[in-house]
Amino acid sequence: MQFAKMHGLGNDFMVVDAVTQNVYFSPELIRRLADRHTGVGFDQLLVVEPPYDPDLDFHYRIFNADGSEVAQCGNGARCFARFVRIKGLTNRRDIRVSTQNSRMTLHVGEDDRVTVNMGEPQFEPGRIPFKAAKAEKTYILRVAQQTVLCGAVSMGNPHCVLQVEDISRAQVELLGPSLESHERFPERVNVGFMQVVERSHIRLRVYERGAGETQACGSGACAAVAVGIQQGLLDEQVQVDLPGGTLHIRWPGPGTPLLMTGPAAHVYDGFIHL
């Protein structure tokens, strides 16, 4: 099986063309391939498939390193867009794709930076999903013998966002796993730790559901900005600094889609016997 290794700001992917190759991935095989010592090693596996809908260009599936399938990955979407152009599967600069539960339009710029229309952030608890009587800008959660304040939003996948004073001292390893599996998030959750530098600039670390802390999380950056805007902390256009690099997010507000722009790097092509 042929594959490519790619990354978006250090969030790394094994990308497989299932348009021209016949492939099947069991959770056990994915876990084996994800192992950084004995396999290929990656945060997520991206599988490019023919479109399920004739109005779209492709469908793509996203699997975490633990073998679980997820519905959204912002960094993965950017790598996906570059992959299908590099491999000659399309020459379009505007690419329409579906994922497990959403549709997106991806634009590949002249500089190979990719802008992803991530759709409108969803704050309604039932759509995240999050157990709450009604939507609030801030929720109080009891976790790891602490009381924390957080925002909750779906960007096609569930996110919990905490504001912290200093990102370097955030309790990512303590609060990340505890919040990820908190009982009020029935499908588990990605946890963002956001430091507001100014209204147009944040620093962010993300503990990803099924993957742990990563170098960058595109949907996590989108979620943090959406929550920050909803809470009145941020402006419409925000620079997000992650450990792996910088993303630019724009969200005019409710009723409009959120746009994420950032790089996607092709590292190497490989072949593996399954």
From Swiss-Prot:
The record marks 268 as: Important for dimerization. The keyword Cytoplasm applies. It is an enzyme of class 5 (isomerase). GO terms for biological process: lysine biosynthetic process via diaminopimelate. Its EC number is 5.1.1.7. It is found in: Cytoplasm. Pathway: Amino-acid biosynthesis; L-lysine biosynthesis via DAP pathway; DL-2,6-diaminopimelate from LL-2,6-diaminopimelate: step 1/1. Pfam families: DAP_epimerase (PF01678). Catalyzes the stereoinversion of LL-2,6-diaminopimelate (L,L-DAP) to meso-diaminopimelate (meso-DAP), a precursor of L-lysine and an essential component of the bacterial peptidoglycan. PANTHER family: DIAMINOPIMELATE EPIMERASE (PTHR31689:SF0), DIAMINOPIMELATE EPIMERASE, CHLOROPLASTIC (PTHR31689). NCBIfam families: DapF. Homodimer. This is Diaminopimelate epimerase. It comes from Edwardsiella ictaluri (strain 93-146).
